[in-house]
Every structure is written in structure tokens, then in C-alpha cells.
Amino acid sequence: MYNCAIILAAGKGKRMKSSMPKVVHKVCGKEMVNHVIDNVRKANISDVNLVIGKGSETVKEHTRDRNVTYSMQEEQLGTGHAVICAEEFLKDKKGTVAIFTGDAPLITNETIQELFEFHNSGKYAATLISSTVQDPTGYGRIIREASGEVKKIVEHKDCNEEELKVNEINSGMYCFDIEVLLNSLKNLNNDNSQGEYYLTDVIEIMKESGEKVGAIVVPYEEIMGVNSRVQLSEAEIVMRKRINHKHMVNGVTFIDCESTYIDVDVEIGNDTIIYPGCVIQGNTTIKEECTLYSNSRICNSIIESGVVVENSVILESHVGEGTTVGPFAYIRPETKIGKSARIGDFVEIKKSTIGDNTKVSHLTYIGDAEVGSKCNFGCGTVVVNYDGQKKQKTIIGNNAFIGCNTNLISPVKVNDNTYIAAGSTITKEVPEGSLAIARSKQINKEGWLDKKGLLKK
């Protein structure tokens, strides 16, 4: 059986009050439309078409790596019109098409699989996703036959007294037999107060033709649409709860899961402990037995097992097994830190490699450098990597001891087994086995205060 999907992503999203298309706003680090695409793919649906409109180039930019096709809806004339715009995608296809909305990011791949299985096994012409709610005010009601099949969808304003009591609502997500859908679209009209083509009218057309229509009921949170910043926040809360619950089930400890913010694609190993206020973003991987103390941010990075991070920022970097970072360290992109290293307080490292067992304990800047293993950086060391025009590289070998308040003027090389005296400004290569001293001699002028009349008696 051939299965495919259409995702409606052409809405303007006026209530978002944004210059961006609604569907590219993110929920837990991923664009809403990409949540839907990815869950469709997890349900083994490979052929996906996006109906786009206002801000189409932006939507394409955010979905270009998702291997989808696009249909253009120049004018937003309703959900039925959006599907009509995708007729070319459906042309000559036989099988089943599911239709989802790009602003409902909480739909799960399990529900999508259930939708296709229910639809295909029951040989329905159409299957709706519905939900039951305590207050259905404003929603279209699902009215069922005695057999359980769907009889019709009635908009709230058109409900009679009995229909108003129904609390099963329409989600706007469907499965259709492709041939029946295309034939029904030919009879779709815009004879309504809004002058729009509604996909719900297709259900009525099918029923009038004697077709079989079913529905599956899912939790309301799965069909929540996002039309405002308030609803975006509500979706974020639901998604975050799901994400954190998944990690806890897999053996991760959260001291306070309600104040821990983890993006949907983050991977975390078991026996890792995460304290409140941590933000873990992008395609980050945290291995086993790590400890992330409060107010740390990690983005698009790999953190190996046994790492401790305290009040620090790590961006697009790799931190080796057993290393400690922080407090108040800043690890900038393209940094690779080895095993059992120590990156201490107020240390900034940018685009550099730090070897195993190296200690950079405090108040140090390292940029565009290769640093070997078992080195020690004294407090106040600066790798001076910028000459005013471009960044230069510094190379430091193994077992180098860098004294406090040292300036390493790039490009420069410090070889293995070297010492640099505190307060030095190094501009030339330091040979292996050497002690480098590059500072002015101390001069004591005896009696100077008395001569200047500054001596206090």
C-alpha cells in the first residue's frame, strides 16, 4: 500500500505578530513544521509534500534538508484550497494520503502510524483524527452514526441543542483514499460566508456519495494548534515535559525537571545528573555519568562520560571523558578538550585543541591554539591570537608550564617540556627543555620616596 503525506504550511500566522512564517517558529529547538515532518518520517512515510504560501522561501530554507517537495498556495482560500494546490503531487497516485497541519507540532509518530493502520485496515475513504475535550466551544463537532462511523462534522455555530452537547472535536488532520479525495475535490465549492474552500466539506461530499468515514480519538495535546505566542509557550511546556520524561525513563536524574530545558534532538546517557536552570540545545550528546550543575548551557556539542560542568557555556565543541569545566567557563565553537582536563573559572577557549590532563584553572584566554597534554596554565595567561588583521595560531607542546600573567604573541611555538616564567611576553619559539624569561629586570631605587617627599613618618 502506497502512503504519502501533505503538510499544510501556508498560513500567515497574523496572531504571532512576527516577520517569520508561523510554522518555522521553534518548539524545544525545532521548527514546528519540522516536528511534523520528522514524526511523519518516523511513521515510515517517505513521500512528503509541503503546501507553502507567504514566506515560502523562509519555509524552504528551514526544511531544505528534509527531502520534501513543495506546492504553492498563492492565495490563502481555505484548507480545501490548500489541498487543491497539491493536486499535482497526488496526480496518478493510488493509495492513502494523510493531511497534517504544520502548526500542530505535538502530533506523535505513534498516532500517525495508528491513523494509517486504522484507515487502511478499515478500508475507509476518509479517517479523521479527533479528540474529546471538556469545553468544545468554538470547535467543529464530530457526529457519529450508531455504528461508530463518522456521520458528519458540524461547525459550532451550526450545532443544534443536541450537537452542542457533543465533546468530540475535529483536529483538521485526516487520512484519505487518494482517488476518492481527488474526485471529491472536484465538487468542492466556496459557497460560505468566508468565500473559502473547507476540507471539512469534503467529508460531507464523501458521505453523500455513500463513502465510509471513520475517526480515531487521541489526547487533546496532540492536536493543539499554535496560532499565538501564548499557544507557542503552551506547546513548549507539553513538549518539554515529554522530552524530560523520556530521559528520566532512560536513567537520567533531573533535580527539577520543570526548570530544565532540553531540545528534542538531544541525547543523554544514563546516570547523568542535571541541576535546575540547565539549557541543552541542538544536536548535543551527553554521555553517561556526567554532572551538569545549575545554569549551564550546552549547544551542538559532544560531552563524553564523567564530565562535570558548572555554570558554564559550551558551544559546538567536544569535551573529553572525565574533564571538569567551570564555574563560569566559556567554551566557544570548534574547541576540542581532551580527557581528564581542568578548565576552571573565567576561562575562555575558542577554536582550540586542549590535550589530556591539561589544567587551565582560572582567568585565561586561549584562542586558535593547539595545546598538548599535561600542560599547566597559570592565572592570567593570554594567547594573543589577533594581530589586528587576522587570527594567528599558537602551538604548545606536551608538559609545558606557563607561568601566571604570560602573554603568548601568536604565531608562536612552545615546545615540549618547557617552562615560561611568570609575567613573560613570549614572541619567539621556546626550545624543548628551556626556561623562557621575557620580562624587564626589577630595579629598586633606594630612598626614592624620601627624595620625593612622599615618605610618611
Swiss-Prot record:
Coarse class of the protein's main subcellular location: cytoplasm
Molecular function, one GO term: glucosamine-1-phosphate N-acetyltransferase activity
Pathway: Nucleotide-sugar biosynthesis; UDP-N-acetyl-alpha-D-glucosamine biosynthesis; N-acetyl-alpha-D-glucosamine 1-phosphate from alpha-D-glucosamine 6-phosphate (route II): step 2/2; Nucleotide-sugar biosynthesis; UDP-N-acetyl-alpha-D-glucosamine biosynthesis; UDP-N-acetyl-alpha-D-glucosamine from N-acetyl-alpha-D-glucosamine 1-phosphate: step 1/1; Bacterial outer membrane biogenesis; LPS lipid A biosynthesis
CC terms in the record's Gene Ontology section: cytoplasm; membrane
Catalytic activity entry: alpha-D-glucosamine 1-phosphate + acetyl-CoA = N-acetyl-alpha-D-glucosamine 1-phosphate + CoA + H(+); N-acetyl-alpha-D-glucosamine 1-phosphate + UTP + H(+) = UDP-N-acetyl-alpha-D-glucosamine + diphosphate
UniProt-annotated catalytic positions: 362
One Pfam family named in its UniProt record: NTP_transferase
Residues that hold UDP-N-acetyl-alpha-D-glucosamine according to the record: 8-11, 22, 73, 78-79, 140, 155, 170, 227, 332, 350, 365, 376
Record bears the keyword Transferase: yes
Binding site for Mg(2+): 103, 227
Biological process (GO), any one: UDP-N-acetylglucosamine biosynthetic process
EC number, UniProt record: 2.7.7.23, 2.3.1.157
Residues annotated to bind acetyl-CoA: 385-386, 422, 439
UniProt keyword terms in alphabetical order: Acyltransferase, Cell shape, Cell wall biogenesis/degradation, Cytoplasm, Magnesium, Metal-binding, Multifunctional enzyme, Nucleotidyltransferase, Peptidoglycan synthesis, Repeat, Transferase
Cofactor stoichiometry and binding remark: Binds 1 Mg(2+) ion per subunit.
Region N-acetyltransferase, annotated ranges: 251-457
Region (Pyrophosphorylase) location: 1-229
Segments of this protein annotated with the region Linker: 230-250
Family listed: In the N-terminal section; belongs to the N-acetylglucosamine-1-phosphate uridyltransferase family. In the C-terminal section; belongs to the transferase hexapeptide repeat family.
Subunit structure: Homotrimer.
Protein task: Catalyzes the last two sequential reactions in the de novo biosynthetic pathway for UDP-N-acetylglucosamine (UDP-GlcNAc). The C-terminal domain catalyzes the transfer of acetyl group from acetyl coenzyme A to glucosamine-1-phosphate (GlcN-1-P) to produce N-acetylglucosamine-1-phosphate (GlcNAc-1-P), which is converted into UDP-GlcNAc by the transfer of uridine 5-monophosphate (from uridine 5-triphosphate), a reaction catalyzed by the N-terminal domain.
Name of the protein: Bifunctional protein GlmU
Species whose genome carries this gene: Clostridium botulinum (strain Loch Maree / Type A3)
Source lineage: Bacteria, Bacillati, Bacillota, Clostridia, Eubacteriales
